[in-house]
């Protein structure tokens, strides 16, 4: 089961700010987090039960640095639809 330390950040871009107007929050996590474990973390720490959770896995790109190949970290993003009138900003953690 995941815990609050597996949630890395809430993503703020032009696209996600538009989604926030519709009640959707985009959360970046470690790849081992599942939909059910994220729902449990949101319920336990924020007191919010999400309406819907969609996930997206992004594999790490291979990048070159000083002539050597390296790889970026793999991440997972969740699109979390919150109940109407609820946001993660106005909840206490």
UniProtKB/Swiss-Prot annotation:
> Keywords in UniProt for this one?
Ribonucleoprotein, Ribosomal protein, RNA-binding, rRNA-binding
Question: By its UniProt entry, which Pfam families does this protein fall under?
Answer: Ribosomal_L23
Q: Which GO terms describe its molecular function?
A: rRNA binding; structural constituent of ribosome
**Its GO biological process terms?**
translation
Query: What InterPro entries does the annotation carry?
Result: Nucleotide-bd_a/b_plait_sf, Ribosomal_uL23-like, Ribosomal_uL23/eL15/eS24_sf
Q: Which Gene Ontology cellular component terms are annotated?
A: ribonucleoprotein complex; ribosome
The protein's matches in HAMAP family, at most eight in alphabetical order, are given as: Ribosomal_uL23_B (MF_01369_B)
Q: How does the record describe its quaternary structure?
A: Part of the 50S ribosomal subunit. Contacts protein L29, and trigger factor when it is bound to the ribosome.
Its biological purpose: One of the early assembly proteins it binds 23S rRNA. One of the proteins that surrounds the polypeptide exit tunnel on the outside of the ribosome. Forms the main docking site for trigger factor binding to the ribosome.
Family label? Belongs to the universal ribosomal protein uL23 family.
Task: Spell out the protein name for this chain.
Answer: Large ribosomal subunit protein uL23
Per the UniProt entry, what species is this protein from, by scientific name?
Answer: Campylobacter concisus (strain 13826)
What gene codes for this chain? rplW
């Amino acid at each position: 089961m995941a815990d609050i330390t597996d949630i890395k950040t809430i993503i703020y871009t032009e696209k996600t700010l538009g989604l926030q107007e519709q009640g959707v929050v985009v959360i970046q996590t470690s790849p081992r987090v599942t939909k059910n474990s994220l729902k449990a973390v949101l319920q336990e720490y924020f007191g919010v039960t999400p309406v819907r959770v969609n996930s997206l896995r992004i594999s790490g790109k291979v990048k070159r640095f000083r002539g050597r190949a390296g790889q970026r970290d793999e991440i997972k993003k969740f699109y979390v639809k919150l109940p109407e009138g609820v946001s993660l900003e106005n909840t206490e953690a």
